[in-house]
Amino acid sequence: MPTNGLHQVLKIQFGLVNDTDRYLTAESFGFKVNASAPSLKRKQMWVLEPDPGEGTAVLFRSSHLGRYLSAEEDGRVACEAERPGRDCRFLVLPQPDGRWVLQSEPHGRFFGGTEDQLSCFATAITPAELWTVHLAIHPQAHLLSVSRRRYAHLCPQEDEIAADSNTPWGVDALVTLIFQNRQYCLKSCDSRYLRSDGRLVWEPEARARYTLEFKAGKLAFKDCDGHYLAPVGPAGTLRAGRNTRPGKDELFDLEESHPQVVLVAANHRYVSVRQGVNVSANQDEELDHETFLMQIDQETKKCTFYSSTGGYWTLVTHGGIQATATQVSENTMFEMEWRGRRVALKASNGRYVCMKKNGQLAAISDFVGEDEEFTLKLINRPILVLRGLDGFVCHRRGSNQLDTNRSVYDVFHLSFSDGAYQIRGRGGGFWHTGSHGSVCSDGERAEDFLFEFRERGRLAIRARSGKYLRGGASGLLRADADAPAGVALWEY
């Protein structure tokens, strides 16, 4: 299977939260560090790097500054070092409740404090030296077992999550990380939580919560008894094994979950590669052969469609479309034109893709009519987490409105009807637009929203008014943006 960016391991960025719920922050002015920020933004993001020398020490690099956290012998801390020296080496000591203690390796003292009174001079661990790890990545991803090189996916018949899939195909391969009570839950695509005995449960109970640990850039999930999740048995069932230290079997990568879509043509049939290499609209049900992985090129904003048979859609002679390309090229790129509830695709020959009378797709049209329009449905986000430029979308406390600047997120449920999406939140209320463009989450009836996939990993959401949903300085979600750009684009 060609890489071509299909399998992108996510760079793990995180925040560190102290005992007073404030985030470790790296300031540009004076390269000082403090713990004053109430939420996770750019200045609060850190990356863990292994120490270049041998041993268990690690380095903390500020994503914002690109510089390293250091602690001097007298306890003074800063984030000034452009290259990691001896004072930048820390030991991470995981505690039973899942929090971390950071110990200066050369000096043996512990790092902690409050507000701008941070130091690395403590000789004993108190609550002020305890840090919670909060992942800064988008929480919906694919989970890859490092030892088996297989992807985790929901097995509905066996009622389990198993790491036995060669490719993360379809909705079952989506895993959502839920941050709760300073720990993480693994949520399957049907909104159930993975318990440490391998069972799937509807509530995030204690045995369905895990402490995150990092080892050589990989993730491990430790349960409340100190054992680690691992694929077990021939089927690779995910459950806590016997090990109390993470080895290769207990390590996982998180990979970016690209949108997977189905397309319906004007004949009301699904576009498919079931009957060979020709891409045709000739099927009545949506299965793997009707599902395509869609990627958007960051520079051109054009998209590719990758099939379950291992080929990209590509333009061939006489305008035909076949799923045979093994590499991305100009002929595999399609320009998307959003037309309300429908989308039109323009191929590299400058012509629109249409459905011919025999159902085959071909890029032979100069204008868009009914045969050139397709319904495009996102199938691998039945539950949705949205992140904008300022943070995640989350219900505002004591209100029916939605915040767009939170470091915690709500999970919303998505349904689809005739080219439009309906979004349901906490308590079962639907999103709807109110007066002056406000977006509320307590609707009794579903309101239609249009999704436009504009950039890699980002979409625009269009309300019935024709305006786009945006974040902003007020932190409220509003439907009043004219263009699908900037604060009107959402990671999903």
From Swiss-Prot:
Subcellular location: Cytoplasm, Cytoskeleton; Cell projection, Stereocilium
Expressing tissues: Exclusively expressed in the eye, specifically in photoreceptor cells.
Entries under Pfam families matching the protein: Fascin (PF06268)
Entry's Gene Ontology BP terms: actin cytoskeleton organization; actin filament bundle assembly; cell migration; establishment or maintenance of cell polarity
Keywords: Actin-binding, Cell projection, Cytoplasm, Cytoskeleton
GO terms assigned for molecular function: actin binding; actin filament binding; protein-macromolecule adaptor activity
InterPro entries for the chain: Actin-crosslinking, Fascin, Fascin-like_dom, Fascin_metazoans
Cytoplasm among keywords: yes
GO cellular component: actin cytoskeleton; cytoplasm; stereocilium
Disulphide bridges: none
Function, in words: Acts as an actin bundling protein. May play a pivotal role in photoreceptor cell-specific events, such as disk morphogenesis.
Family as reported in the entry's similarity comment: Belongs to the fascin family.
Name the record gives this protein: Fascin-2
Organism annotation: Bos taurus
